[in-house]
Amino acid sequence: MFYLFLADGFEETEALAPLDMMRRAKIEVKTVGVTGEFVTGSHGVTVKADLKPEEISFNNIDGVVLPG
């Protein structure tokens, strides 16, 4: 499982391109809203995160993505 962390002001291309590529490759990835359930990027795109930080399981983690 990979976690892609999102905070308000994230760079949409840096977050959504890797997310799209990982999902197309059937890699299990969930978005985590650091600043809330709905996170707005630097260009006004709002994304609904899959998880809240307290819902993360560190028992089966393969990696994290931290977009700018």
Regions of interest found by a model, annotated:
Residues 1-68:
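Extended, subdomain-level signal for the structured scaffold at the beginning of enzyme domains
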